[in-house]
Structures are given as structure tokens and as C-alpha cells.
Amino acid sequence: MYIRYKNSSKFRRYSRLYRFTTFAYQKNKKAGVALRYHFNQGLGVFVLPYKNGHVITEIAHAYDMSDYLNDNRRTSYARSGIYWDNDTQYFSSKLEFEYFYQISEIVEQNLSRTQIMSEIIIPIKNGVSASLIYETENYRKLNNNPNSISLSIGWKGNLKWSF
């Protein structure tokens, strides 16, 4: 299970720059993650915007809280990444390379890691799409380098709520 929310906004004077906040919850026993809460916040730059997509880079402060509810222990990271999004007439694709450098010493193990994700998104109808995703994590100091393949159904649109 993977739930992710990202909010971003461009700077008015510098439209190639944006700020973002991301929250994610992940459960993947096959990859050794019983439950991970993830948060990051930072700045991004549109390095190469083009008609059907873009290449961006981001820097951020991030933290994880894994496998312990109602606790304030967390692992902090400096995060950087480069991302390529491309749209075609029939599908969209994403390729992401992220590096997390552990800056906290609360957790005894060094959890610095590289994460690579590729995704193909095929639109179905009315904002509904199918996504095929491959992810891998390579830890610097651990022998556990999990990877996973998943298929998901997504919906993109506005909620029509009124208050």
C-alpha cells in the first residue's frame, strides 16, 4: 500500500522555481517496510521544460518515521533528486532518481539510500488511469536492497465538495 500527497507552487517572479511539501505512507512487507511515514519539504527547479514534459531537480529536508506509532523518533535526511516526466498521445512516463543522505543519528544504522522509480501511466477513461511501477532502494550500509513491481489504479480530478 502506498498513499502519497504532494502540494507545490511556483514562485511568481521566478516561474522555473517552485516549493513543495510531500507526505507519504507506505506499507510493503516484501520490501521490508511494515509501515513508513515520510515527509519532505524543499525547492525544485524546472531544468528542462519542453512541450511534452520536463526534467526537474529538487533539494529538500526529509524525515521518516518507521514502524513505531505514537513515538517521536525519526530519521532525518538531506534529499536531492532528478525527475523526468514525459507525455505521449497514448501514455505518460516518469523516471526518478533520489538520494537520501542521513543527517540524524537517532537510528543506529545508516539509512542513507538511493531510490529509483520508473512508472508508465495509461489513461483509461474520465480521469481514471492504470500505472505500472518499478521501484528499487539501494542502501549504502545495509545488505537489504528491496525492489518492487506494482500495478495501481488512479484517479486525477477535483473533488466537488462544498462547505
Task: Show the residue positions of the predicted features.
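Membrane-embedded beta-strands of outer-membrane beta-barrel proteins
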Residues: I3-N7, Q41, A78-I82, I116-S118, ...
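Glycine- and aromatic-enriched membrane insertion/assembly motifs of diderm outer-membrane
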Residues: M1-K27
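Hydrophobic alpha-helical segments of small multi-pass membrane proteins
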Residues: F39-Q41, H61
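Outer-membrane beta-barrel "beta-signal"
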Residues: N147-F163
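Outer-membrane beta-barrel transmembrane domain signature
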Residues: N52-S129
